[in-house]
Amino acid sequence: MNEVRPAAAGAPRGADAQPRAPLSLGLFMPNCSNAYSISTYKPEPDDWTYEANARIAHAAEAAGFDFLFPVAKWKGYGGKTDYLGTSLETMTWAGALLATTARIQVFSTVHVPIFHPLVAAKMGATLDHIGKGRWGLNVVSGWSEREFGMMGIEVLPHGERYARTAAYVEIVKGLWTCEPGTFEHESKWYRIHGGWVMPQPTRKPAIGRTAARSSATRSTSRRTTTSPSTISAST
């Protein structure tokens, strides 16, 4: 799964042009209530359930889709529909779908303030083994005071939270590739000494990046292209 960008002005064309990566087609999954519509009209009231998600995942795989992408929510928006108020946590959700599919790639979405990067790296490596290399990670910085407030987590200013996300991605990637027990990281947000994740992934999992980002995450996004794929995602 690779990001396809339009050719820059003056870029070589025709026989001299570099081949472009094929476009991959994925599906946003309804792992949250009212996922596809905020409307009160719901043809399928239990659209968020695992059974519904498994059925859609199998249909998507049979139809040739390349990946499945979930939304991470911890609290809904209230009102008559309580939009996204009921949801399946995406690490657990991905494990179940990876175990029952054969080809399609399955992502998990992780909020940086909620999952420690070492924990995310360990869970991700486990999911990679369950799916035999088909798992991917979507890292989001998080902004919702509604959600984080109920956990006592402070929402950082925009630039700072994206700088923290850059450190987060570097930690996860480092834990997946370094010699066990040798990973070291110290920053404003994290201190990791003798970091250890075993088993490591069978390959470098795809890491999703945020579409709206600071210079820190732009730099990290460039570095994450060393993994098989980098995609753009919403914050």
Language-model region placement:
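A general structural signal for well-ordered secondary-structure junctions
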Residues: D66, R103, G181-T182
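N-terminal beta1-alpha1-beta2 module of alpha/beta enzyme domains
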Residues: N2-T100, Q200-I207, S214-T224, S232
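Short strand-loop junctions, especially beta-strand C-caps/beta-turns
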Residues: Y41, T109-H111
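Internal, glycine-rich beta/alpha segment that forms the wall or movable "lid"
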Residues: E3-L23, P113-S227, I231-T235
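Short beta-strand segments at enzyme active-site cores
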Residues: G64-A72, V106-F107, G136-V140
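Conserved catalytic cysteine-centered active-site region
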Residues: T100-S108
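Active-site-proximal glycine-rich helix-loop-beta segment
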Residues: G64, A102, G131-G133
